[in-house]
Amino acid sequence: MQEYGLDGVFMQRFITEIRNESGLKHFNKVLNSAMKFANKYERAICVMYDLSGMQPGEEQLLLKDIAEIAERYSLKDHAKNPSYLYHNGKPLVTVWGVGFNDNRRYGLKEAAHIIDGLKSQGFSVMLGVPTQWRTLNGDTESDPRLHELIRKCDIMMPWFVGRYNETTYPKYQKLVEEDIQWAKKNQVDYAPLVFPGFSWGNLKGKDHNSFIPRNKGSFLWTQLMGAIRAGAEMIYVAMFDEIDEGTAIFKCAKKVPVGKSTFVPLEEGVESDHYLKLVGEAAKILRKEKAVAFSAKLDTKSPNPFIRHMYTADPSAHVWEDGRLYVYASHDIAPPRGCDLMDRYHVFSTDDMINWTDHGEILSSDQVPWGRKEGGFMWLRIVLTETAPTISTSL
């Protein structure tokens, strides 16, 4: 993580495991190693409780567990444990699995008990909620008290794993933008989730039909840049080491001795650390150490992103007050006759160099004195100098 610039990790503790002696012993051993090396390599670490399978009444088990951890690892003394993650001036604890409508035994009452208990112990809280938490539909229960619980917390993190693929993602980028607006209005911080792909193959066998392709990192990068463009100030990457669901980003062998079992490896053509590098680069952009990038890897065989059906000559690009890049292209689309007979201007714009808006034609050669009867214009840069304010206003 230090090598690739990943800021830190959330260490999951499952209530269903720590309720028994063997599970508690295992998770304590893993946490002890993680705490030790988080400080050694100066990576942030935060305890995260997964409530899946929790029974009503086990809220106190969680509160007792975190109190013991806080004392054992000096979570409330930043000088003694500088790597433990703080938020709003307090050590952070994450509680995942609140508000889902999948018939869980616990509900908002138990979640409220946990949140209030953590707050009373001096922690800040990040709450893991369903995708449709804001609209209270889809994967989310319809009880508006969920919003009250979210407002009690310091950060919320909606669960997106399995909800979309690279083709359907744009709708969810819009959802993230609207989520962030709600969060700012209600003074709660927001951590959108991204994931590299998905497969049940390693857990349930190769014939299982639940699969979301990674597209050699393009899917992950699209989400990372989408979250940053939407205004995210923090991002939760799911997951570092989740092999069962095919979401791991850590180094992974492509060929392993599996016998009759199934193993879904990384794609051919990518290095084992490819996803670590992508997340590390996104972290630099999120921290504003470098500018936003528009592609995980430039494909020189890809078609022109916005002009595939016309001849253009000497297009000019400008960034106006709205922060978008506008491309003004002279062309001869109706009908196409050649590059020396450009008879109209077309405008395209973008804010990310990936998604382009076609604003259409803004004028033709017969509308201006410098146009020729047979078609054709003077140089575009001269036209823009004379008419840019008018053109910009009309878009």
Task: Name these PLM-found stretches.
Residues 2-295:
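Glycan-processing catalytic domains of CAZymes
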Residues 296-395:
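Carbohydrate-active catalytic/glycan-binding domains of CAZyme proteins
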